């Protein structure tokens, strides 16, 4: 079953799904902007297109991730994103 989600007044949209190859996951698109997300469980984020500038929990320096790159976010934490142009991602819930 697919589950549509919308955040930040429609600037971030995702579709959640479960498959045998990825497990529980979502794919989404982010418009230009700055966002803060909270996690309930660990997440593995893969940038599909564009770039995400990310500030991970416990770090002080922003890092840019581009298409094909992966970053991990601990559960029960917050991470910050800056998006300069529309970008897409795959988020796996670990």
UniProtKB/Swiss-Prot annotation:
It catalyses: a purine D-ribonucleoside + phosphate = a purine nucleobase + alpha-D-ribose 1-phosphate; adenosine + phosphate = alpha-D-ribose 1-phosphate + adenine; cytidine + phosphate = cytosine + alpha-D-ribose 1-phosphate; guanosine + phosphate = alpha-D-ribose 1-phosphate + guanine. InterPro entries: Ppnp (IPR009664), RmlC-like_jellyroll (IPR014710), RmlC_Cupin_sf (IPR011051). Its EC number is 2.4.2.1, 2.4.2.2. Keywords: Glycosyltransferase, Transferase. It comes from the Bacteria. It holds the Pfam family Ppnp. One of its GO terms (cellular component) is cytosol. GO terms for molecular function: guanosine phosphorylase activity; purine-nucleoside phosphorylase activity; pyrimidine-nucleoside phosphorylase activity; thymidine phosphorylase activity; uridine phosphorylase activity. It is an enzyme of class 2 (transferase). SUPFAM superfamilies: RmlC-like cupins (SSF51182). Belongs to the nucleoside phosphorylase PpnP family. Catalyzes the phosphorolysis of diverse nucleosides, yielding D-ribose 1-phosphate and the respective free bases. Can use uridine, adenosine, guanosine, cytidine, thymidine, inosine and xanthosine as substrates. Also catalyzes the reverse reactions. PANTHER family: PYRIMIDINE/PURINE NUCLEOSIDE PHOSPHORYLASE, PYRIMIDINE_PURINE NUCLEOSIDE PHOSPHORYLASE. This is Pyrimidine/purine nucleoside phosphorylase. It comes from Salmonella typhimurium (strain LT2 / SGSC1412 / ATCC 700720). The gene is ppnP.
């Amino acid at each position: 079953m697919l589950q549509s989600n919308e955040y930040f007044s429609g600037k971030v949209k995702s579709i959640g799904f479960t498959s045998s190859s990825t497990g529980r996951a979502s794919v989404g698109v982010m418009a230009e902007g700055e966002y803060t997300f909270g996690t309930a469980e660990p997440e593995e984020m893969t940038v599909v297109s564009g770039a995400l500038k990310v500030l991970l929990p416990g770090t002080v320096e922003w890092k840019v991730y581009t298409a094909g790159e992966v970053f991990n976010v601990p559960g029960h934490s917050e991470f910050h994103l800056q998006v300069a142009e529309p970008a897409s991602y795959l988020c796996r819930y670990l």
